[in-house]
Amino acid sequence: MVKSKYLVFISVFSLLFGVFVVGFSHQGVKAEEERPMGTAFYESFDAFDDERWSKAGVWTNGQMFNATWYPEQVTADGLMRLTIAKKTTSARNYKAGELRTNDFYHYGLFEVSMKPAKVEGTVSSFFTYTGEWDWDGDPWDEIDIEFLGKDTTRIQFNYFTNGVGGNEFYYDLGFDASESFNTYAFEWREDSITWYVNGEAVHTATENIPQTPQKIMMNLWPGVGVDGWTGVFDGDNTPVYSYYDWVRYTPLQNYQIHQ
């Protein structure tokens, strides 16, 4: 009888220990492997690569976005084109395009060759972003390059760390960005972000830098309720387009810093 109890005790202990080991191992896999991390790439947009990219839709963002994202508003055939068009939905007056990577990216150089829309009330962007909808438990971290269609001779840089923004910086380009393709970039390090225009460093931030891996994104949208920032969008101007020639990501350890 004593021997029987002893065997039962050993069996229960073995079962519990096995569960503990399996659980511990599974948690390690989740932390180490589940978040998909991207590597260096160059995207020419000759065709749509659904292994690298996802088109947004069908859903809406916050209240200042007067559009619903639709996948058909993103096309790629040598150039990637985002489009705003009229379409009254239950929530918004227009449909628009947004593209994002499937993988996450960390410190490095993020570059784009693009031509923004020159229409008041619109925002053309290239940025990185993550939040709780992108990965469970992630803070709202974001790094922005944005063009306001009301004045495409200027570019806006911004970033958010755990939802805290207020880091806007406007730079006068000396040319109209909507008239030709130019290269815009930011170098993201653990302790700084430096933005570039055609290879020239034009702004650096060093305070409260975001740390979380993020997805690379591009979108074009009409604003509403933020007229002081974007200007007023006139729907008679639709369709509206922004164009992207190429995108490149280079991990920090893989490139020489711009001089």
From Swiss-Prot:
Pfam families of this UniProt entry? Glyco_hydro_16
Does the record carry Zinc-finger as a key word?
no
- GO MF terms held by the record: licheninase activity
What is the protein name for this chain? Beta-glucanase
Entry-linked Gene3D superfamilies: 2.60.120.200
Q: Which organism is it from?
A: Brevibacillus brevis
Reaction it catalyzes: Hydrolysis of (1->4)-beta-D-glucosidic linkages in beta-D-glucans containing (1->3)- and (1->4)-bonds
Does this entry carry the keyword Signal? yes
EC code: 3.2.1.73
* Domain GH16 residue range list: 35-255
**What InterPro entries is this protein classified in?**
Beta-glucanase/XTH, Beta_glucanase, ConA-like_dom_sf, GH16, GH16_AS
Tell me the keywords, alphabetical order.
Glycosidase, Hydrolase, Signal
